[in-house]
From Swiss-Prot:
Other information: Present with 125 molecules/cell in log phase SD medium.
Record region (Disordered): 475-533
Subunit record text: Component of the TFIIIC complex composed of TFC1, TFC3, TFC4, TFC6, TFC7 and TFC8. The subunits are organized in two globular domains, tauA and tauB, connected by a proteolysis-sensitive and flexible linker. Interacts with TFC1, TFC4 and TFC6.
Keyword Transmembrane appears in the UniProt entry: no
Comp. bias regions, Basic residues: 480-490
GO terms assigned for molecular function: DNA binding
Gene Ontology terms: cellular component: mitochondrion; nucleoplasm; nucleus; transcription factor TFIIIC complex
Pfam families from the UniProt entry: B-block_TFIIIC, DUF6581, TFC3_eWH
Disulfide bridge positions per record: none
Taxonomic classification: Eukaryota, Fungi, Dikarya, Ascomycota, Saccharomycotina
Protein name, UniProt field: Transcription factor tau 138 kDa subunit
Gene name for this UniProt entry: TFC3
Length: 1160
């Protein structure tokens, strides 16, 4: 079977294939690709395919490696040359990286790796083979892979005895992306207790339990699990115990023992993570003491949805950012302005970016940075002869943004208490008298900041240096190209003076820049070329502290304050980091590595003391004034305050293990015994082997080298063994109700069993949820059933029935599987159906006009949400949706010409009406459209074909199932007849003086009549008293397996004279020419069933959308009826007194709307 696709889809597929094959494929490969979608037995089809491909400007055809412009027919018919199809280099880069070669930053070597990974396709390639294929140094491959890591998916595996990564390209990899949803440990507390309870002897190892429940996948889950175990032990739901191995008493494992059930409630509000919870490792684990000090983040109690539903919320508009106004002060130098701004900023200082924004603007950032190098100082590089107006720049950062902060000398002294490190001279040196006026000095010494030194060769062959734009060159002189500026080399010794001249201007310029300093500025003190980033400076001592930046100085002072507050002694752990962060007012915890670096600097400057405990390896810090006794008291206090765990020891008991490795470790004997046993087994095997060899030598003569060859072959085969990667994509057979997938599977399983067996088969469903109890599943289902409501339930059932019919038709499942209720196969059908719906692609052209030609653009603003979407929502969501909806109406009259749309609607109506009577017809047989232009008919037919309303088979038109399905589903008029009969029966009973007792939930049809009579005050309703046992009830829905009313209701007539309503007058059904309306046949007569179906559909839309307008009705029924047909139906209903008009030309149903067909 050949799957036909659009030409643009084929071009995209071919482009991707070329990109995944290093930018070029052969012509035969092109036929293999397109052969999946087109029948290439005909040469014209091949010509069409190749023409579509080469029409794309990025795709080129090569003949023997050279680009050719031959005709498509010549290329296909030429068998003497080798042809291939390729794409341009920029297109190759764009398809693989999303950027052109100039825009991308990954580099050529990394792109070469990317090409090989793309060529490997879905199979992928490991890093070892990747280095061999590309010929790159394996040591460099790792860094280059990091540059393209965002484009790849990787998984670790063992290959030839090495741990390598299997790499695949995300763009061409079709593996499902593993979802990593957030897991709230509160929801799993009851599961942990239940699993331990059902385990053997009610005891489980902590590590083994964590692996079974899959809490060992990431560090956060592992910490959360340990915190949960500690909380359950504290609340006495579980008990921590040590279990001794029966074979080796030296082996003890940490376990938990079941004590009692956890209360039946959603989560545990009082549960909090314990920062000092013990880990689950063995007793001798050296990491236990370190992990005890790690804090675990608290559980998330914040719910954004609940917050938004609170009353009294106030919406504040965000004020527009104030635009920076540049000073552009022409009267004072930049140095004076910079000093003034830095002086006004006080001890806080001001960043260089803020200064630039205020004085010159961002456009002159680089120029300002260069000019400020003359007067800005650092602590380790101070200038002279600057008077009392000195500016210091200090390295600082905010998050990842690094910059310099400017201070005046006086403010910096106050900030750092470093009067000794910063000297403030009394004044400037006296300047000598100048005989040249100021104007001449300015003209002689003016140099633009963006000017550069250029050079050329004069007529004598000498290099001439000049500022750009200042040298006048004669017209006949030949200027050396600039591109040789850096590549010119000194030829011989005669040009030695010229070489000296080349370097002299640079040296002169450098000497001018650093004439006031002893040595050139280091890279650490100067910003980068773009002025956006800076590098950390050296460690500078001021005020007794050693720091690299202002932030480091602030942290060190905060550390001293915290140490004084807590008593002068502390462990370097999470609690200490949080205390420092809290003191500094930081919303997040400071980086541990940064704080440790500050502590080391404080230890070097003797502001703190530090030592490391020899046993636990933990670091303790203290103030120099604290004595040894205080330190020992603190250590003993921390040990005594630590909660004792695993105090109970259990001997001679059997426990269940999920992990076989842990089971073998628990039952392992002493190592000496194991070694003796293995040695005895080796000796026994050697004797048996020797006897077997002797027997074989007697029976046959064997070459001596056979054994060696076999051993060598065994080694070679072992070396050639490839790693088999486990296929993770398998049909899921086990679920857990605590996960999102598990809840979805539970809902689907209930829908499947209820629709097939007409009852919920809990015995079948529980097999899919082995880790959940039946009561837990029922509670989960009850909550979901109440939330979805009856309409949501019907939506699920209808969807499942549709999928089941399609699966049986396509033979994906047999009737036997359905009858035997094989839930695994049935749920897999559902899952595969949803995946196909999601993956269905839609490709558009770049040109908007092409899209208008190829596609029918349908306005979907009125169909944003379907009925099922609203039905699947909760009551609160429905209410919020209604409150957010804005009801508007256009006041001004529309001036749009509706003649064309009316003509198209008439053509649609005629075609629908004809195809209902004769499902297949030709266009020439439509007599009703003889007076309509052929172009209009063709356009409408193509639109209807794209909307899947008709099929085109040559010149014949064939009706699809769309129209009959809509009429059958939305036009069920039989309920109206049943409702009218029910109304007659009720009238007879009540007119006879009888009452009606209702002890079951009324059906939909009977509720129409009863609500109508009650709202018209024609009935009275009372409660029948009954004695019943009062017991606590839980909230359940009336629609959910409980249909009995408690107590029963009784209804009786209020006034017998008003029960018999006047019968509706007969109104003529609108008719016309043959096939002019959907309910008119070829002879001009009415189609009764079609008429009742379209009327029912219109009435139902008005019932559920009160006040709906005619245009809105037409948009909701556009697949069946035209605007003219709907207006005739509404006019007929108005005359029948079924509808009532409202303001703004809307419609509303009358009180007895269900009696439409009373006399028809």
């Amino acid at each position: 079977m050949v799957l036909t696709i659009y030409p643009d889809e084929l071009v995209q597929i071919v482009s991707d294939k070329i990109a995944s094959n290093k930018g070029k494929i052969t012509l035969n490969q092109l036929w293999d690709i397109s052969g999946k979608y087109f029948d290439l037995s005909d040469k014209k089809v091949k010509q069409f395919v190749l023409s579509c491909v080469i029409l794309k400007k990025d795709i080129e055809v090569y003949c023997d490696g050279a680009i050719t412009t031959k005709n498509v027919t010549d290329i296909i018919g030429d068998a003497n040359h080798s042809y291939s199809v390729g794409i341009t280099e920029d297109s190759l880069w764009t398809l693989l990286t999303g950027y052109t070669k100039k825009e991308s930053t990954i580099g050529n070597s990394a792109f070469e790796l990317l090409l090989e990974v793309a060529k490997s396709g879905e199979k992928g390639i490991n890093t070892m083979d990747l280095a061999q294929v590309t010929g790159q140094d394996p040591r460099s491959v790792t860094g280059r892979i990091k540059k393209i890591n965002h484009l790849l998916t990787s998984s670790q595996l063992i290959y030839k005895g090495h741990v390598v990564k299997q790499l695949k390209l995300k763009k061409f990899s079709h593996d499902g992306v593993d979802s990593n949803p957030y897991i709230n440990i509160r929801d799993h507390l009851a599961t942990i207790v239940e699993v331990v309870k059902r385990s053997k002897n009610g005891i489980r190892q902590i590590i083994d339990l964590k692996r079974e429940l899959k809490f060992d996948k990431e560090k956060r889950l592992s910490k959360a699990f340990i915190a949960a175990i500690a909380w359950l032990d504290e609340k006495e739901y579980l008990k921590k115990v040590l279990v001794v191995s029966p074979k080796n008493p030296a082996i003890k494992i940490r376990c938990v023992k079941y004590v009692k059930d956890i209360p039946d409630s959603k989560g545990s509000p009082s549960f909090e993570y314990d920062s000092n919870s013990a880990d689950e490792d063995s007793v001798s684990d050296s990491k236990a003491a370190f992990e005890d000090e790690d804090l675990v983040e608290g559980l998330d109690n914040f719910n954004a949805t609940d917050l938004l539903q609170n009353q009294g919320l106030v919406m504040e508009e965000k004020e527009d950012a104030v635009k920076n106004e540049v000073l552009l002060n022409r009267f004072y130098p930049l140095q004076n302005q910079t000093y003034d701004i830095a002086d006004k900023s006080g001890l806080k200082g001001i960043s260089t970016m803020d200064v630039v924004n205020r004085i010159t603007g961002k456009e002159f950032q680089r120029a300002f940075t260069k000019s400020s190098e003359y007067y800005l100082e650092s602590v380790d590089k101070q200038k002279e002869n600057t008077g009392g107006y000195r500016l210091f720049r200090i390295y600082d950062f905010e998050g990842k943004k690094k910059f310099f902060r400017l201070f005046t000398a006086q403010n910096f002294q106050k900030l750092t208490n470093a009067e000794d490190e910063i000297s403030v001279p009394k004044g400037f040196d006296e300047l000598g008298k100048s005989r040249t006026d100021l104007k001449t000095l300015n003209e002689d010494n003016f140099v633009a900041l963006n000017n550069t030194v250029r050079f050329t060769t004069d007529s004598d062959g000498q290099d001439i240096f000049f500022w750009h734009g200042e040298l006048k060159i004669p017209p006949n002189s030949k200027k050396t190209p600039n591109k040789n500026k850096r590549k010119r080399q000194v030829k011989n010794s005669t040009n030695a003076s010229v070489a000296g001249n080349i370097s002299n201007p640079k040296r002169i310029k450098l000497e001018q820049h650093v004439s006031t300093a002893q040595e050139p500025k280091s890279a650490e003190d100067s910003p980068s070329s773009n002025g956006g980033t800076v590098v950390k400076g050296k460690v500078v001592n001021f005020g007794g502290f050693s720091a690299r930046s202002l932030r480091s100085l602030q942290r060190q002072r905060a550390i001293l304050k915290v140490m004084n507050t807590i008593g002068g002694v502390a462990y370097l752990r999470e609690q200490f980091y949080e205390s420092v962060s809290k003191y500094m007012g930081s919303t997040t915890t400071l980086d541990k590595k940064t704080v440790r670096g500050d502590v080391d600097l404080m230890v070097e400057s003797e502001k703190l003391g530090a030592r490391t405990e020899p046993v636990s390896g933990r670091k303790i810090i203290f103030l120099p004034t604290v004595g040894e006794d205080a330190i020992q008291r603190y250590i003993l206090k921390e040990k005594d305050s630590k909660k004792a765990t695993f105090t109970d020891v259990i001997h001679d008991t059997e426990i269940y293990f999920f992990d076989q490795t842990e089971k073998n470790r628990f039952h392992r004997g002493k190592k000496s015994v194991e070694r003796i046993r293995k040695f005895q087994n080796r000796q026994k095997n050697a004797k048996i082997k020797a006897s077997d060899d002797a027997i074989s030598k007697k029976s046959t003569s064997v070459n001596v080298s056979d054994g060696k060859i076999k051993r060598r072959d065994k080694k070679v085969s072992a070396g050639r063994t490839t790693v088999v990667v486990e296929n993770t994509k398998e049909d899921k057979t086990v679920y857990h109700a605590g996960t999102k997938d598990g809840v979805q599977a539970l809902i689907r399983a209930v829908v499947v069993t209820k629709s097939i067996k007409n009852e919920i088969m809990w015995d079948k469903i529980t097999k899919l949820f082995p880790n959940n109890s039946l009561d837990n599943l029922k509670k989960k289902w009850t909550a979901r059933r109440v939330r979805m409501g009856h309409s949501g339930w019907r939506a699920y059932v209808d969807k499942w029935k549709k999928m089941l019919v399609l699966a049986i038709k396509s033979e994906k499942i047999s009737l036997r599987d359905v009858e035997e209720l094989d839930l695994i196969k049935l749920l897999d059908i559902w899952t595969s159906f949803d995946e196909k719906e999601i993956k269905r692609p839609l490709f558009l052209y770049k040109n908007y006009e092409e899209n208008r030609k190829k596609f029918t653009l349908v306005r979907d603003d009125t169909l944003t949400h379907s009925g099922n979407d609203l039905a699947m929502s909760s009551m609160i969501q429905r209410e919020i949706s209604s409150l957010k909806k804005t009801y508007t109406r256009k006041i001004s009259a529309s001036t749009k010409d509706l003649s064309k749309s009316q003509s198209d609607d008439y053509i649609r109506t005629v075609i629908r009406s004809i195809l209902i009577e004769s499902p297949s017809t030709t266009r020439n047989e439509i007599e009703a459209l003889k007076n309509v232009g052929n172009e209009s008919i063709d356009n409408v037919i193509m639109d209807m074909a794209k909307e899947k309303q008709i099929y085109l088979h040559g010149s014949k038109l064939e009706c699809t199932d769309t129209l009959p399905d809509i009429l059958e589903n939305r036009g069920n008029y039989k309920d109206f007849g049943v409702a009218f009969q029910y109304r007659c029966k009720v009238n007879e009973l009540l007119e006879a003086g009888n009452a009606i007792v209702i002890n079951q939930e009324p059906s939909d049809i009977s509720s129409w009549v009863l609500i109508d009579l009650i709202s018209g005050e024609l009935l009275n309703m009372d409660v029948i008293p009954m004695v019943r046992n009062v017991r606590p009830l839980t909230y359940t829905s009336r629609r959910f397996e409980i249909r009995t009313l408690t107590p029963p209701l009784i209804i009786y007539a209020n006034s017998q004279t008003k029960l018999n309503t006047a019968r509706k007058s007969a109104v003529k059904v609108p008719l016309g020419k043959p096939f002019s309306r959907l309910w008119v046949n070829g002879s001009g007569s009415i189609r009764p069933n079609i008429w009742k179906q379209v009327v029912t559909m219109v009435v139902n839309e008005i019932i559920f959308h009160p006040g709906i307008t005619l245009s809105r009705l037409q948009s909701r029924c556009r697949e069946v009826l035209s605007l003219h047909e709907i207006s005739e139906i509404c006019k007929w209903l108005l005359e029948r007194q079924v509808l009532i008009t409202t303001d703004f030309d809307g419609y509303w149903v009358n009180h007895n709307w269900y009696s439409i067909y009373e006399s028809t």
